[in-house]
Amino acid sequence: MTIADQVTGSTIAGTAGVKPADAKPVAAKPRAPAITLPAIGERELRLDLFRGLALWLIFIDHLPPNLLTWFTIRNYGFSDATEIFIFISGYTAAFVYGRAMLENGFLIATARILRRVWQIYVAHVFLFTIFLAEISYVATSFENPLYTEEMGIMDFLKQPDVTIVQALLLRFRPVNMDVLPLYIVLMLALPLILWSMKWRPDVTLALSSLLYAATWEFDLYFSAYPNGFWAFNPFAWQLLFVFGAWCALGGARRMSRILASPITMWISIAYLVAAFYVTLTWYVPQLSHFMPKRLEQWMYPIDKADLDVLRFTHFLALAALTVRFLPREWPGLRSPWLRPLIVCGQHSLEIFCLGVFLAFAGHFILAEVASGPAMHALISLSGILIMWAMAWVISWYKRVADKSGAKTKNAVGNADLAGGG
């Protein structure tokens, strides 16, 4: 099987397979959409696998640094789990709602997208409420106001009325609650993105790139309350989201020859090795003496808020190698050892919210009970087990509901956080 067979499926536009000699004169038809979609069939487990992996890595990164932190990708390159999460979300959202737009029209697809945006917004508000209660309870019970300052809720305690309004407007967020607001904004833009990609996918990606460049050139950003800006700038991160959508709607298939090229493979490997060396200089300063000063001046700071181009290209290199060496039919995807990751990835909205709650609980235990390496490992592994258990319960409940006559969803990539529902 070629890489072209691994990345996407069939074409839905045009009249492929009709020989010129057999063709009959027909009346002119409206121009077919320019996008392609994978055929509906078996679920794309690679998406679930890496989305689940991203959820686990985000949880570990939200904890105080510990031994397991060294197993997260942010210590070995420029990008981290956030890039994986946003790309897959864009991919799955485009697949689910791109098909809905082609089959049911713009208005129906937009209505479904807005319904999902509302669900994510409600989840964010609910998580915000629970998270504030958790932090406030710990800070009060242990008479340690540093928790409120460290987690960024001091303004809420001083002006709860104003802060709640700002939180509802997505302008005020405690620490570790920046992903869902970003996703809500990106999903609100999805109808326009899909409508544009329906006819001009490459032009849509080019316009997204121009907006990304304009963000850096003109310092575009979303302001936050009480000051500053969003931790993830939607004007910049939309590029990764749109790129994921572009790949889902035929872009990955059109790139199959590039992905199959040995040149692409070796360039990706070389870039990842170079990025790994740069990250080593953060922990072994002596190695920085071997880096050209001009390169350091050009490279730093590697901005996460505006999705630095080094982070974006690092993710592209990782994705290129993943597609090449992890085919869709890889037997390991059926392994029981990977099942916990896949199940978590299939219920990403619920598991992400749970991970934010567990991360602060772990932070509190490490600060108030014990902070040794053994406790760090215990907290990290316990949190992952709880996330897996919750995902299993949700899966079990949905199976029971399906057997009771609920509507069964048969899609390659359930959008979940990205869109489904």
Which residue stretches match the model-derived regions?
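Alpha-helical transmembrane segments and their immediate juxtamembrane cytosolic regions
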Residues: 2-14, 18-421
